[in-house]
């Protein structure tokens, strides 16, 4: 997948998660989790697009949230065989977030 593909995927994911945010009461753990995940995705988008350079604190904040997405999507994906439609539904998220994690780790090393 190319840079534009990653950015489109991340933007689409942000849009979907922002639609779910109002369903949770502010102050609940679900609301905080989703808000933090959206912020992590926005940080990743900024880093990959080079629109702005996220701070070290923003990158350190984003990394565990991205790793959480990878973990949860991998567990969901691995319940299915690679030919299954559900496997194919979860796999792109795992691949994109794995790339995002690598980019964040690289930025943190610099």
Question: For each predicted feature, which ranges?
Answer:
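Compact DNA/chromatin-associated regulatory and scaffold domains in nuclear/nucleoid proteins
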Residues: 64-78, 95-110
